[in-house]
Amino acid sequence: MTSRALTFLPFDTVWKMRIDHPYSLLVKEGDLLWSCGQCPLSGAGEVLHSDELLPQAKEVIGFIERFLGEIDCKTTAVTRLTVYYVKTNDGDAAALDRLFQERFGPQVLITPITTPHFYYEGMLIEVDVFGSTRQKRHCVYVDEATGVELSVVETDALAWANLRVIHLPEDENPFPEVLERLMRRAGLSRDGLLAEQWFAGDERVGKSLTSMAWSPALESCGVLSIEHDGTDLLAEMTFLKNASVSRMSAGAALCLPEGLEIRLAKAENLFHVTACDNSGARGIVEQTRRIMHALERTLTDSGLAFHNVRKTTTHYVSGNSAEGLHENMAVRNDYYSRPGPASTGLPVKGFPNSNALISVTLTGTVHG
C-alpha cells in the first residue's frame, strides 16, 4: 500500500444491532478495504423481506453500493464478496452468484457459503466485501482432468483466489498436486499465502482434507462444514505477490494453555491470525475468553495490538438466537475501541477437524 490514509465508516449512522459494539461498517486503509457483514436490516435493526432470500440479497447489494460511495469508492473496487446464506432451495448458490455478478461484474470473486441459520429470525443472508482501488486483473484457471477451478483477482501487490471443487475425487491424494499446478499457472506460491479458509460440503470431504498435508489449516479450524449446494469444496485464499510471508504457531512459542491454537502469518504490511480452542472441554463463551486473551498475547509478542486489526471474522457453532451471537460477541467487543475494525460473526454447521466451538480470525496492517 502506497498510502496509509485510514477511513472508518461508522456503523450506527446506518443501522443498529441489538447489542452495543465498537465495529465499523467499512474500513479503508490505503488502497485496501474491508466491510462488516452486510445484512438486510432496517435502520432500527429489523429484518427486511423476512424469509425471502433473493429480495434480501438485492437489499444487501443496494447497501454495499451506497456504503462504498460514502467512502468515495466505486463498485469496481470490489475484489471478493463472501455471500453467507441459508439454503432454501437447491441451486440457491448459482442464483446468488448470477445476481451478484450481474451487479458487480464477472471480474469479482463470489463465494457462496451456506450457514445453518442466522442470529435474527427471518434473516437469510450476510455478505462480506473485500476490495482494492488499484487496477486489477481477473483470470480463471481450470484443471482439465479434474475440473478443479482457481479464480484469481490480482493487483500488482495482492491476489485474492477462490478454489472451487464440484466433485472431490474419492482418492484425494492427487488433489494437492492439482492445486499446486493451478497456483503455478496463476503465478502464486505458498510462500506468499497470507490467509486461507476452507469450506467442505460434506463430512467426508472435510475429514479427507487432514490427510493432504498441504497446510496446517486443513487439520484444524481452517475447515468449516457447510451444507452442500452444488460444490464439494470451496476455499478462499489471499496471497502477497512480491513478498514472502513469515508464519508461526504461537501455542508452544508463548506457552499458551493446552488446546489453544494460534497461527500468525505476517508480511511487510499485512498480517493474518487464526485462533481456536481445540480442547473440546469448554463452552463457547469460555473458549472465546481464552482465545481473545491468547490473541492479545500473540499480537503483543509480534509488535502488534488490536488497534492494528482492520477485519475480524468469527465462526461459531450455536443455535439460531441473537443470544448465541451476543454472548461471545460481548467478550470480543471488550478488546476494541471505536472506531473499530469491520467485523463479521455468524453460525456455522461445524468444524469437522477440530473440537472447537468458535474460531476467530484477524486481518490487519502492520503499521496501523
What is each model feature region?
Residues 1-62, 66-79, 85-310, 316-368:
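N-terminal presequence-like segments and the immediate start of the first folded domain
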